Amino acid sequence: MATAGKVIKCKAAVAWEAGKPLSIEEVEVAPPQAMEVRVKILFTSLCHTDVYFWEAKGQTPVFPRIFGHEAGGIIESVGEGVTDVAPGDHVLPVFTGECKECAHCKSAESNMCDLLRINTDRGVMIADGKSRFSINGKPIYHFVGTSTFSEYTVMHVGCVAKINPQAPLDKVCVLSCGYSTGLGASINVAKPPKGSTVAVFGLGAVGLAAAEGARIAGASRIIGVDLNPSRFEEARKFGCTEFVNPKDHNKPVQEVLAEMTNGGVDRSVECTGNINAMIQAFECVHDGWGVAVLVGVPHKDAEFKTHPMNFLNERTLKGTFFGNYKPRTDLPNVVELYMKKELEVEKFITHSVPFAEINKAFDLMAKGEGIRCIIRMEN
C-alpha cells in the first residue's frame, strides 16, 4: 500500500488518565519494525478487561494509553521478516500471542507463549521498548500488545490470527477474546460428556460463551449461577436450562447444586474471578468424576482454600487461559465454526456505536446493559 514505510496520521481514542472518558485524538502511528505488522482496524468491541485497566484501581497506571484488544482488521503493511501474513489479509488481533518457537508454542498442551504472553503493565513494543503511537512527538502507550481503539495499530506478528476473508469482521471480531475464552473453557478444558450436567458461575460475556460451549458439547442440563436474576432470560438463548441465585438460599450454593443434581454437577466453569465462587465451583462437582474449570481472574491477594479430601475423592480442578486456544493456530478454525453456522455469534452482539461515540460502550458496560457493543471505526 502507498502508506507502507511511512508514518500514518489517524484517529485514536486516547485514555489520558484513569477512569476519565476517552478522547478522540489525531495520533501518529509509526511503521512496523521487524516481526511487526500495522493493521487497519475496522471493528472493535469493549471487553471488561479494558475497563478494568482503564479504571486502574489497584493496577499499575500506564497513561496516556490506547486501550482495546477485541477487534477485526486488515493488514496495511508488514515489517522485516514477516512471512505469515501480507498486506490485505484479514486478521483478528489477540491479547496473547503465539511465537511458534518457544517450548509452550511447541507443546500440544499449552498456549502460554513465553515471548508474547499477556503483559498488562507493558505499554511498549517488545522489539525496542518503544511505543509506535505518538502525539506531537510524545509517546502514547500500548495495551496488551494490541491497542485496537485506533484506526491503525502496530502489533507483533505473533499476536494476529489470519482468518477467512469471507468472514464478516463486524461479527467475528468478538471471537478474539471473551467468546473464545468461555467457549474453549467448556469445549477444550471441561469437555462435558453428552448428556452431562454443567454449572456455569457468572453469566457475563465469558460465562454465556461457556454455556454455549457446554450446549455445543452436548450437555443436557446447564445451570447458570448468578447474583443478577435479570441475566437469566438472556442466558436461555445460550443453552442455560436452570438458574440458581445464591441470594435465594440460606445454605452454600455448592450444597444447593449437589441437592439439585444427585450429589454434584459433572462439570463446572467459573467465570467471575470471585474467590468464593471459585471454591464453590470446585466443591459443587461430583466426587469420582467431577471437573471444575477456573476462568475468571481473581484478586492478586486471593487464596484458594478447600479440604484436601475434595481432591482425594477424585474431583479435578483445572485452570485455563484464553480457552486453551493457540491464537494463530486455532482461532482461524473457530472462525470457520461460525462460517458453518455452528456458532451463533450474533446473539453475543447487543449494541453498536460509531467510533466517535466509543464512551457510550463504556456507559453500557458500567450499567451492565447488553453483552457486547461493537465499535465501528469508519462510520
From Swiss-Prot:
Keywords for this protein: Cytoplasm, Metal-binding, NAD, Oxidoreductase, Zinc
Pfam families: ADH_N (PF08240), ADH_zinc_N (PF00107)
Subcellular location: Cytoplasm
Residues the entry annotates as binding NAD(+): 49, 202-207, 226, 231, 272, 295-297, 322, 372
A GO cellular-component term linked to this record: cytosol
Top-level lineage group: Eukaryota
Residues holding Zn(2+) 2: C99, C102, C105, C113
GO annotation terms (biological process): formaldehyde catabolic process
Keyword presence, Flavoprotein: no
Residues the entry annotates as binding an alcohol: T49, H69
Catalytic EC class: oxidoreductase
Subunit note: Homodimer.
Other comment: In maize there are two isozymes.
Protein name (database record): Alcohol dehydrogenase 1
Organism: Zea mays
Lineage of the species this protein comes from: Eukaryota, Viridiplantae, Streptophyta, Embryophyta, Tracheophyta
Gene behind the chain: ADH1
